Regions:
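A generic beta-sheet turn/junction motif
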Residues: 148, 159-161, 182, 209-211
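A short beta-strand-loop-beta hairpin characteristic of the jelly-roll/cupin
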Residues: 170-191
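Short beta-strand or tight-loop elements
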Residues: 140, 151, 162-166, 201
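Conserved metal-binding segment of the jelly-roll/cupin
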Residues: 188-202
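Short beta-strand His + acidic residue motifs that chelate non-heme Fe in jelly-roll/DSBH
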Residues: 153-156, 178-180, 197, 203-209
Length: 299
């Protein structure tokens, strides 16, 4: 039985890694890609999705989101006020596992809600935006996200296919020099314009201008044709995704995973030191751990 389950994981991981036109080149990158962990559940979402496979999603599939573009200037004004108060910022406490790797590029964020209730700080500092996103049940996660001049987010795919990613341009260079590329297709942000894409395709972003880019960043629940798959999405979101909740400031709640992240980060630091000192030894250790985990789970 364990071998059958393992083969299902391998098959689903293979599909995830080869689903798009753009793929990781190195085998080691494909094997270590964290999206493989959620391969089986993601394949369920892909198979039962109401939206056909595409790098970019037509926002008209979600008419309820029109209220955001209709009120984009109101949202923009609250984002500007937050940024002026230096509240759109990186994590100061190593408590944001999901986006920790972005911070070294200068990327910053201010959470509005994350797979649960809206954050206390968001209700206090940007109530109009919070009211707007809370009026749309499909919105599972929300934040203001800033990509500063010269910043580049490396190629990656998000691990969970239970949502689509939505960006609403608030403060942008309105230039082709500030863009996102999803599965090889580029889009550049524009003030007041929304774009939606499947974040489980490989994507990256770059701001080659001297102007900050601020967008309203949302996770929109993926619609599916089978109610049990929708139920799986709800349960997974409440248990796993909600555990990655983090804070903007004191008073905000932190999910269980991010409470553990400072300790996980220390292990990662040790791993990076080993990699720097002896690369072959690092990979030997890394894959030995992978094999032990596989053996422990499936055999």
């Amino acid at each position: 039985m364990g071998i059958i389950v393992l083969l299902v994981f391998v098959f689903c991981a293979f599909y995830v890694q080869n689903r798009g036109a753009v793929q990781h080149v190195k085998l080691v990158r494909k094997i270590s890609d964290h999206s493989n962990i959620f391969g089986p559940i993601n394949c369920l979402f892909y198979f039962f999705s109401k939206i056909k496979k595409s790098a970019y999603i037509d926002t008209s599939n979600f008419p309820e989101l029109k209220t955001l573009t209709d009120n984009w200037e109101t949202i923009r004004d609250e984002a500007i006020s937050l940024n002026d108060a230096v509240q759109i910022k990186s994590s100061e406490q190593k408590d944001d596992l999901g986006f920790n790797s972005f911070f070294k590029t200068g990327w910053k964020r201010f959470y509005l809600k994350w797979y649960g209730a809206s954050l206390f700080s968001a209700n206090k500092l940007c109530p109009k935006t919070v009211n707007l996103i809370n009026s749309i049940p499909a919105v599972k996660g929300a934040m203001f996200a800033m990509l500063p001049p010269g910043a580049r987010l490396v190629k990656h795919r998000d691990p969970y296919a239970g949502s689509f990613r939505y960006h609403l341009g608030l403060v942008t260079p309105n230039s082709e020099e500030c863009f996102i590329s999803v599965d090889g297709e580029e889009y550049y942000w524009k003030d007041g314009e929304a774009v939606m894409f499947d974040e489980t395709f490989i994507h990256f972003a770059e701001n080659k201008t001297d102007i900050n880019r601020i967008v309203l960043f949302l996770d929109i629940k993926r619609p599916v044709t089978f109610f049990l798959v929708d139920w799986v999405n709800e349960v997974f979101s409440r248990i796993v995704m909600a555990a990655t909740t983090t804070r903007n400031m004191d008073g905000d709640k932190i999910g269980a995973i991010n409470r553990l992240f400072p300790y996980i980060f220390k292990v990662r630091v040790v791993g990076k030191r080993i990699k720097k000192a002896n690369r072959p030894a690092y990979y030997l250790l890394q894959y030995s751990v992978y094999l032990l985990i596989i053996y422990g789970i499936f055999f």
